[in-house]
């Protein structure tokens, strides 16, 4: 292993010169350069340059190194064409990856290793005012470049602030600023034959809110892997075509640049050992043709200001936990559930933390145009299991055997307590082997080496002979798993027979190796293997899982349960106006089914600009003069969600008051008008139209039909009541609603059903459900003559109902004495009570 580091120390301001305040720059070239310095140190001192280092690939090759780690707390520059291939690992830590000043504009950088780590360094805040540190915290350079950066491996990890190209400033001794700029790359490509993982950076919010890791370039970027995903509870983003930040939630992109995601290998990779991560993909143009996952987490594509988002044929965009079985914290006393030492906070249905937050779990597709092409899959289905294990110290044992080596008896009969240095503890889990151990905030006794695996022969009951990836020891309680202790006290070369031990464990021989490298121990090590059932006899655990604890907690509080892995998630379409009828097209596969005991998934459509939304029949263009987002009804219906919501997002605060479903505010405030145009039909188990400020309109000839579409998501039978200001809902479920007064006395534009917005008009407006039909508004309600409806439960919630004959109501209106609300005549009352028996 060769490790080189070029650091940037702190200097006292009043005792520093500009000579030492140079940007730290480590230059990597294909061949090393001979030194031009004088032979003696004294003679060379005056010509030495601070903060500068250089390494040639030929030097690395000549040294026979399989592992290379380079750290520059500043710039890591490539001097022209560079091709570097390492036998085991390549780790690059830097403030920016860029070309050197002298490199050709069309330079090509090719890096490869079985394991590749790209890690960014974020400079910490300077220690008080009297210190200065020569670190440039810049953004990508916009200087012209035709350079190519290609990196490949069997596993690629990205951690921290990884920036290609740099433009920033350094503070000088006189407090002035010196500009520092290095060119980036026209195209960056990362190719992993296995996974491409995003690991946690220095802090949760160091790059943006909730984001600790990013890949950032001003040019095009292509990521190819068996699958991309963030680690457990990691917030990460990938940005291509970066120009500058507009706000904390929006970026100005180069309209000519593209972020492309591709797939390597055959077949679908198994769901990774990860939960509750967040991954944002941002560029003017995004082509998602690979496998992007964030199990039980959040994926955002185009939500930072994209022009066009395409989910390509064969792609998978998934936040489903189906197939995932993962150790995730636990509870000792049944009162508090903790992960990594912190109390776990549960989310209510809707997956928003509060009124002003955005979606925390689900998928967000944003931009002016979102196209889901044939055979592209968006998976928000329910599934997955988070296992709990809270160690109970007491009669079951005073130490947790997952973290402590077993006591041994020496040759003289004395007790020996090995340390983790000689006797590290891991776990192995039968089944499909991931090849590399997962990385998570809550680790095991010892972190396995990257790709570390063990080959075991036959003879241990319940464990087939084979090669297994060494996992963190917290996995030892998983179904079928084994605790693995490498008995370093026995030394190497142990080839003894597999035999049982008196404590229920087994002793056997195993050979350590590193995946995808050909590196392995030539001699075996003694292993102590302990099945999960036997491990439970060594130490006592409360194995209440995440979902089991959440259900018990809700029962204790007397409120509806929080969101669980079995629940399907929400797909938010965060669209911007400007694409006409091409704003959204869905021809792919939508998975919104819940696992057993779960709630179905939701599609929520929002116009992030004016808020105005219109839904037109298939093949129709945007309405002339309409200022908003135009959607094709067939595309909305084709997704197959249990709930279709236009205008807003639902919010449930778990805990006190957790019975009420409201609509989110902030960037998700329901605003503008929601219009269902003539000829358009919305069909789902339940359909909601909401607007706090605009009107809800169903034109004559438009319809909403939930008959035969299946079970709705959670409803009144699950303990929920909707509390909104202006909503039209057609549902196969049972809906309870109450009116919500808006802040500042604001009112909506009301609800109009069966109106003729532009003559000529034809057809009937139809509203049919197998459950509930709700019209709740704080303003006028209009029911046209051509409206037909059928439902089991009709609920009209209005601030005012004006009852009288047509003549009396007309006279009151003429005298400006008729308040906004519903005008109820005898004829209208008869219609409401009669309903429609033509359908269902």
List PLM regions with ranges:
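Extracellular and secretory-pathway beta-repeat/beta-biased strand scaffolds
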Residues: 1-840
